[in-house]
From Swiss-Prot:
This is Developmental pluripotency-associated protein 2. Residues 31-85 are annotated as: Disordered. Residues 85-119 form the SAP domain. Interacts with DPPA4. One of its GO terms (cellular component) is nucleoplasm. Keywords: Nucleus, Transcription, Transcription regulation. It is found in: Nucleus.
Length: 301
């Protein structure tokens, strides 16, 4: 390359370098005109309508001619006369106090007094001293009970006569059944259980005397001039009849459910009943012997 050609090339290169260094670049933001977007508006309207679930406000205006349901509060109307405190509950007394616009505070006795003082001032009522008495209620009247046993238990129906004798009512049929049940129960036992030794320090045999004595089985006064009156003995919860000075037998007869007058001895047995009781025991002894001597039914004669 010639000298002139090289010089012109260098000049051109220097000019280009100067031009690039002298150029100043300025950045200006580009603004585009916003066009109305109908699609976006329709989508927003649809989404807002689907998300809005709030119900419209209820109108509180009552229109004429339309019956609206009303809530009624039940109220207990108090009676014309105040019942006894034992026959009414505390909650009922409070309802009556609310009916009269009275306070319901306090115990049952206090509420009862407050109600009586306000609305039943002229009525006389029994006021218990303690709250326990106020809670107690009188139960129904007890039904009449007819005794079906041997002795006179508590709670049985008793008939008091002018003479002072108390009689427990028992039908003859029931007495017979009770006597047979008693006899059958003792008959199944051995003879040793129906007899026991007589204590030596007791006065079991009574002598003849004037007047009368009370018989337990007959339930009435009988002449005491006969020989054979005995005094019953009580041992191990059972009643025994003296037979000999060393032995006594079980009482198989059913005593009468009659209580004598006060001061009359009621644990005596007349000679006739002593003989009947001994006869029953003798029959048991004979039957037990016959049962032992009897051959089995499957044995040949």
């Amino acid at each position: 390359m010639s000298y002139f050609g090289l010089e012109t090339f260098n000049e051109n290169q220097s000019e280009e370098n100067l031009d690039e260094e002298s150029v100043i670049l300025t950045l200006v933001p580009f603004k585009e005109e916003e066009e109305p977007n109908t699609d976006y508006a329709t989508q927003s309207n649809v989404s807002s309508s689907t998300l809005d679930h709030t119900p419209p406000a209820r109108s509180l205006v009552r229109h004429a001619g339309i019956k609206h349901p009303t809530r009624t509060i039940p109220s207990t109307c108090p009676p014309p006369s105040l019942p006894p405190i034992r026959d009414v509950s505390r909650n009922t007394l409070r309802e009556w106090c609310r009916y009269h616009n009275l306070s319901t505070d306090g115990k049952k006795v206090e509420v009862y007094l407050r109600l009586r003082r306000h609305s039943y001032s002229k009525q006389e009522c029994y006021i218990p001293n303690t709250s326990r008495e106020a809670r107690m209620k009188q139960g129904p009247k007890k039904s009449k009970i007819v005794f079906r046993g041997i002795g006179p238990p508590s709670g049985c129906q008793r008939k008091k006569e002018e003479s002072g004798v108390l009689e427990i009512l028992t039908s003859p049929k029931e007495s017979t059944f009770a006597a047979w049940a008693r006899i059958a129960m003792r008959a199944a036992q051995s003879m040793s259980k129906n007899r026991c030794p007589l204590p030596s320090n007791v006065e079991a045999f009574l002598p003849q005397a004037t007047g009368s004595r009370w018989c337990v089985v007959h339930g009435r006064q009988l002449p005491a001039d006969k020989k054979g009156w005995v005094r019953l003995q009580f041992l191990a919860g059972q009643t025994w009849v003296p037979d000999t000075p060393q032995r006594m037998n079980f009482l198989f007869l059913l005593p009468a459910c009659i209580i004598p007058e006060p001061g009359v001895e009621d644990n005596l047995l007349c000679p006739e009943c002593v003989h009947s009781n001994k006869k029953i025991l003798r029959n048991f002894k004979i039957r037990s012997r016959a049962k032992k001597n009897a051959l089995p039914p499957n044995m040949p004669p």
